[in-house]
Amino acid sequence: MPVISPNAFAPPAASPLSREPQGLLPTELREQVRRLERAHSAARAGQTMVPLGIAEIDALLPEGGLLTGALHEIEAGPAPSGRVAAHDGAALGFTAFLLGRLLDRSAVGTILWCRQPSGAFDAPPYAPALATWFDPARLLMVTARREEDLFWAMEEGLRGGIAAVVGETRAAQPTAGRRLSLAAEKSGVPAFLLREQPGPTQSVCATRWRVASAASHSTPGLADLGPSRWQVELRRNRFGTPSVDEIPSWLLEWNDETHRLAVVPQAFHRSADAPWSIRAA
């Protein structure tokens, strides 16, 4: 039986610009490019936008949802000590939430999850925890010896008609990212890259999220236990609506009854011991 070798991640040939834009200020040119990108994303054949069910976030995403045939990146936020391990679970959980929203629209399909023996995160996904968002029986785990094998498996998976592809990597690989983005666009299958280290500002990904765990609000009768909270930043939104904030950020809380994430109101961001500031009317 022949052995299939991983694809060489060679950069695609770049096409030169036919002409330089004339008479546009940098801000005007940037906004014009963004409009073209949004129009291009909305016109992609066979692709849909999946709402996250969080109005504040959906309002910034293209057509009010997450683009299916695209590459999305999720970073673990830095812990106070400088280590990211403390927030691995938050990044994994947010990824599982995104997958759950996508799978709500699909009754069938497998999720291909690729990682290395010494993965970017401390431990592989935990099936009972994933069951909060989707049936873990739909998960197919692939362990790759080398990072290039991991990217090869992801690209092959995007061509295989499955529901979604996830890969864990320690650092950004621009060439691999371009190939994955093109494969996702062609197949209409979403690809997710979970990264331990922050990536470059410029990227082909449709969205980039940074997720960190946050202190939960204690539930009466359960001591210090409370619903999970994550601090989520949308650090790149290639086809979406520009935000008034340079990097929009939300404190999200999981609701076990509604099975939804919701933005925590600003009044509930404070700790129990923090003093209230009272302003005269």
What label would you give each PLM region?
Residues E75, W113-R115, L140-T143, V165-T169, ...:
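Conserved beta-strand segments of the P-loop GTPase G domain that flank and frequently precede/overlap
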Residues F121-P124, T201-V204, P242:
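Switch/connector loops and helix/strand junctions flanking conserved nucleotide-binding motifs
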